[in-house]
Amino acid sequence: RYSGLDEITTDNVKNLKVAFTFSLGYNKGQEAAPLVIDNTMYIVSSYPNVLYALDLTKPGAPLKWKYEPKPSAASQGVACCDVVNRGAAYANGKLFFNTLDDFTIAVDAKTGKEAWRTKMGDINNGETMTMAPLVMKDKVFVGDSGGEMGVRGWAAALDQSSGKIVWRAYSTGPDSEALIGADFKPFYDSDKGKDLGVSTWPADAWRQGGGTVWGWASYDPDLNLVYYGTSNPGPWNADMRPGDNKWTSGIFARDADTGQARWFYQFNPHDIFDHDGVNENILVDIQWKGQPRKVLLHPDRNGYLYLMDRVTGEVLSANAFDYINSSTGVDLKTGRLQYVKEKETKPNEVVRDICPAPPGAKDWQPSSFSPKTGLLYIPHNHLCMDMEEVEVGYIEGTPYVGANVHMKPGPGGHRGAISGFDFMQGKEIWSVKESFPAWSGALATAGNVVFYGTMEGWFKALDAKTGALLWQFKTGSGIISQPTTYKAPDGKQYVAVLSGVGGWAGAIVSGQLDKRDGTSALGFVNAMKDLPDVTTPGGELYVFSLP
């Protein structure tokens, strides 16, 4: 999420103008990052997941081709949190992306012709796919969505040439199906033992246990390891699933070729609050206490920024980046998150003012690390909730939640922020408050500029060192996507972002939900009742450059 381009700087960013725009034609939540390869920009829309190619060599970047996968309309009915898609990946002349109805597709980047299509899941049991694939060597890494539908999470690698599934690893169940074998050496004792994906669950609960893989994955070519997070256990009613509920709400390191697990760490054992573990893992090499370390940075929904040794899985530090009252910290000796008993949810009893809420102190929206400033730029939420556990039964293909939730703003009344965080010192350097959750990704550049968008539709540029606002532009709809920057054929630097409010946070607008029902969108509507007053649905690409 960092670019070495530096034509746009803190001094001249105020002069940015719109270079061109493009309508996606679908007014749902747009979470994708525009992808630029060989003078062509590629964009994947929300459902129906149309892939567009724009010609950057011509004025106005006209449409070169579009590919329409025509996913099943029924997939919209089982999507948890809007019909979003987080974008495409590229390698060896092909574009790879997922459809809401569980296909991974490869398309020829020059012609837009389908190369292969592989069915990965089944919408009839509640599975969907929303993540952006990750390219690693000759493979494509993908995973499923549907943690609120009682599905069983998995991650898989496909052959780039043929689309054949090379390996698939489940997030729950016996070691043989989780691809846990002799090479598995977790750092902490609580992750050691045989078939923990079964024994840390009651009876056969692991079969509907969640642990979906819908967020971000990272690949270290030197170690040949892929790192990815697993989502919440199902259902949200934690009393129905006593135990740690392995291997949910944590991070796996796996051999990219075989899928065999090397280590696992659980951010949220026996996840009580739907805090998952799917957020981004940023790979950095640093000096830590006088020793070189290969580390990863993981800002989790539970509100802690984890600094981890990515070779061993050891937690080196875990520092809060937003307000937390549901836990007191992470025990670095055991690796365990320390829950606050008074905030633990209970059956048929409302526990009030739990912070952070289920979307966490940040959700999927990716942060950005700048090696120039040494800061991590974290777009995050500032939300609390009232929560009550209720009994729920599993019916295939239907919601499997078991909780009543009402979210609300955190202390101070704002609902989001973006901050510059020094992970070496474990402290925030600056923070900019936002009225709504900062649901877009962050982009840092070598020009010491940080770009991000707001749910009202403002696209903003901040000084990377101080957080000072340098420039902003009002787009037609709220921004929940990932800004990107690129060097065009004319040699100039451009910045691109999709506008189109939605996602879990913006479902009240994109789904036209009734604000009187505060439990709608899994309780998010209660915190977003005023969002329809400031933005409307959309689906538009905006690209900016200097004059």
Give a label for each model feature.
Residues 302, 443-538, 542-547:
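C-terminal structured "cap/appendage" subdomains that terminate the fold
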Residues 107-112, 153-164, 244-260, 308-313, ...:
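Beta-propeller blade signature
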Residues 2-121, 445:
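N-terminal cofactor/phosphate-binding cores enriched in small/glycine residues
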Residues 128-164, 271-330, 343-355, 359-364, ...:
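Repeat-solenoid scaffold signature
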Residues 22-33, 66-89, 117-132, 170-216, ...:
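Extracytoplasmic beta-rich repeat domains
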Residues 142-154, 201-203, 228-245, 382-411, ...:
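Short, conserved, GDST-rich strand-edge loop motifs in beta-rich repeat architectures
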Residues 56, 87-119, 125-171, 176, ...:
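Hydrophobic or amphipathic alpha-helical targeting/insertion segments
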Residues 29-50, 77-104, 128-148, 205, ...:
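Repeat-blade elements of multi-bladed beta-propeller folds
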